[in-house]
Amino acid sequence: MAAGLPPLVVSPDLVKSRPERPAGQAPAQSPDAPEVQAQPSAPARSLPTPESPPPAVALPPVGTPAEPAAGAAPAESGPIAAGATEIRAQQISGTRAVELVAEGNAELRRDGILLSADRLTYSELTDEARAEGNVLVAQGTDRVEGPRANLKIAEQVGEFEAPQYRFSRRSDPAPGEPVREISGSGHADVMHFEGENQYRLENATWSTCQADDPDWYIKARDLELDYDREVGVVRGGSVIFQDVPIFWWPWAEFPLVAQRQSGFLSPTVGVSNKAGVDISVPYYWNLAPNYDATFAPRFMGRRGVQLGGEFRYLTPGYRGESRVEWLPRDAVTGEERALGSVQHQQQITPNLYGSLDLNAVSDDQYFEDLSSRLSVASQVNLLREGRLSYVASDWWSASALVQSYQTLSGEDPYRRLPQLLLNANRQDMAAGTVFGFRGEYVQFEHTDSRKPEGSRFTLYPQLSLPFERPGYYVTPKIGVHHTQYALDRDLSGESDSITRSLPIFTLDSGLNFERDTTLFAREYLQTLEPRIYYVRTPYRNQDDIPVFDTARFDFGFAQIFSENLYAGGDRIADANQVTAAVTSRLIDPGTGAERMRATIGQRYYFDEQRVALPGEPRRGERRADMLAAFSGRVTTSSSIDSAWQYNPREQLTERFNFAVRYQPEFAKALNLGYRYSREVLEDLDLSGQWPLGGGWYGVARVTRSLKENRITETIAGLEYDGGCWVVRSAVHRFATNPDDVTEALFVQLELNGLASVGSSPVNLLKRSVAGYGKINEPVSDRVFGAY
């Protein structure tokens, strides 16, 4: 026996008529193995899995005289020792010193590797096995089949003729994502084993679509699979879809287990009336595990060639990303156009945090001309802000910021250069009182010399005494709101120093009643929760105070339970008013989930309004509009959400919103929405996604302005699920104003587990169609350039 070779156990089969291996039997998994989420695909090719071998007969090493006694039963071997080799067959001949020949369902096992064939020849001296006829090499979930193979077992070096193969690995998911088993299969002329987890294939195919005749696959002159680095390399390759080549690569690298990998991302192709034919071919650099970059050249048929790039980074203490776009010359406008964006967040010390958010474009029409997304094209202001925040404890914090905007449409807001804030809320005060405080210093500046500038200093200490008992609560609160203005550019001719001090008193109280009830043959816990909220703020003339950042709150349930009508610090409304409201809820007693909620409320005024913004009419009536809202899940598959604002003085509806959704299962959703605001808008919105049969799905949305008698937004799309691939198309038309309409076409082919081609409408559909489901989720992560 050669020195240094592992021990060998040879076991002739005790039963001549050994059963065949069952076809299609899945490999056994450890009971401790994590559950995996399989990717949708066509039926997988059946691969044989050998059953457990019969009891082994242990033979002593060559030269050992011990022999079993005549007629004695052969000894059964226990588990195979690490590094030991076991051979089983119906017939074994030869000697260990030269070579052993095993015939008839022959198997060789060592350290989790199985080599089986009709005939096996094994040389212990060279550790080389030659296999012929129905050859199978298996290790874990990996399988390779073919007619002939030569393999050095320990080194895992050799060749396999005309193999069919399937390799599977579990992904290493990000927190919150499921574990997925990512499999690839194909066939080749020759497979070269080049060490553990290293394979090189000639004239090979590769597909993550598991089927005997996959709809798509990679075809390569040379294919390398390196499962140590989890990287595949294609040379002279193409992607075949439905027997038609759609890609060709002289060389490409791709991840095997869905990890990030440098290389070209899938190209995006689209069409819009603003940009024309729109093609982008991004290149992705995986620079390190915690930072990467993308270079994205973009060709627009009507505009020209745009260069773009993005850089991202992430560490335990900070994270951020930067993005640039540059169009040297717009063929339509003849001008240079550009975009820049920087976002950064950092934990400087355990209590000190910093952030930076800078955004800029070359001109006001940049997004409207160069974006096909309504949410982007309708942007009004671009934020430019730097912020430091200090959290000293669980009851107080401070922050400092500088802030300005690039205004694309409308009036420029004031810049805050700087703004300092101090907030506190301490619960453990004497006699159960709660201390609150808000302090602010802000310097306002404006680019328009016709507008006033100056600083505002605010102190607002508050003291409250909550009484909370089962079934009710009462919380009185008193505070003094003090404001000091120092005006640098006072255009009114009044004093450049203004002081305002106002006491503010509120009383918040509520009751909570509960009872068991039955609705639609189901038991619920029903609540009745009346609430009364009183505010008293004396009048102070504030007409000489400029308006830097103040606007009236939108009227709604949040506003009627607030102490001030205005957002911002330039107006403190006089108030002697009470708000009364009642809420009733249906709660599932088993889960605690809220099934339905109904609320109605109204504010009552004891005095007329005297404080107002410039040009704002003052309220004279004693009753505010009535508010009502209802939301809930009517059935397990349908829900309603509605809100109503009613003017009792004129007996008119001021605003009304209504939305109903029917969603019986994934990728089935129908939505109806109606929005009304008197003299402002009246919109009807319909959207949905629904299977049409045969793997086809329809998705659409239409929004019509009943007030203007025109359609403001339309989406129409079709999707087809081919099992291991999906094709999507969508047309999007929207109008930011009646004279400016944008139209865009999205077409995408997604090969599950490989790549996508075209421009994806998925984000658009998720934003626009409530309940939209991506029909091929969950899928294996894209591997060609996915990140």
Curated annotation (Swiss-Prot):
Region span, Disordered: 1-78
Low complexity bias spans: 59-78
UniProt xrefs under Pfam families: LptD, LptD_2
One BP term from GO: Gram-negative-bacterium-type cell outer membrane assembly
TM ranges: none
Cellular-component GO terms for this entry: cell outer membrane; transporter complex
Entry similarity comment: Belongs to the LptD family.
Assembly and binders: Component of the lipopolysaccharide transport and assembly complex. Interacts with LptE and LptA.
Role, per record: Together with LptE, is involved in the assembly of lipopolysaccharide (LPS) at the surface of the outer membrane.
Protein name: LPS-assembly protein LptD
Native source species: Aromatoleum aromaticum (strain DSM 19018 / LMG 30748 / EbN1) (Azoarcus sp. (strain EbN1))
Gene this chain is encoded by: lptD
